[in-house]
């Protein structure tokens, strides 16, 4: 990307990075949620660090987080009582939109996918 003069890196994160708790999973016997949330929090921090390092190369580094649960086979197996979910296609569309933003104006951010689709996130400059 440096040789190409720019680009976009999008890390996929989760609301679990910011909101501890059981989430949609009724059975915590596996003990995976603290590790999952902790790894997503670390990924958001890494996103900010790499964005800082690559800003001069016009490479945007952002994290995309589901604004609402994405109905995947795993979630549908473990989760209960979700009335409002997002489709994987909707999330993918948000990733494409985020990849097209100006790297000088949106980088180092964790953005919910609905904010990308409705344009409600605010670009900013590094100046």
Regions found by a protein language model. Give the residues of each.
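Catalytic loop of short-chain dehydrogenase/reductase
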Residues: 8-42, 47-56, 68-70
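Short alpha-helix in the Rossmann-fold core of NAD(P)-dependent oxidoreductases
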Residues: 4-5, 39-40, 84-87
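Short aromatic-enriched loop/helix-cap "lid" or pocket-rim segments at secondary-structure transitions
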Residues: 21-24, 73-77, 120-125
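Catalytic Tyr-x(3-8)-Lys segment
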Residues: 28-33, 73-90
């Amino acid at each position: 990307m440096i040789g190409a003069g720019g680009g976009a890196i999008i890390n996929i994160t989760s609301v679990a990075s910011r909101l501890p708790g059981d989430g949609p999973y009724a059975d915590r016997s596996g003990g995976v949620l603290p590790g999952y949330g902790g790894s997503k929090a670390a990924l958001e921090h890494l996103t900010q660090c790499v964005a800082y390092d690559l800003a001069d190369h016009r490479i945007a580094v952002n994290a995309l987080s589901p604004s609402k649960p994405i109905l995947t086979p795993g979630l549908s197996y473990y989760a209960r009582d979700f009335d409002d979910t997002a489709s994987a296609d909707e999330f993918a569309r948000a990733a494409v939109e985020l990849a097209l933003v100006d790297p000088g104006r949106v980088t180092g951010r964790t953005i919910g996918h609905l904010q990308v689709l409705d344009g409600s996130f605010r670009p900013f400059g590094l100046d």
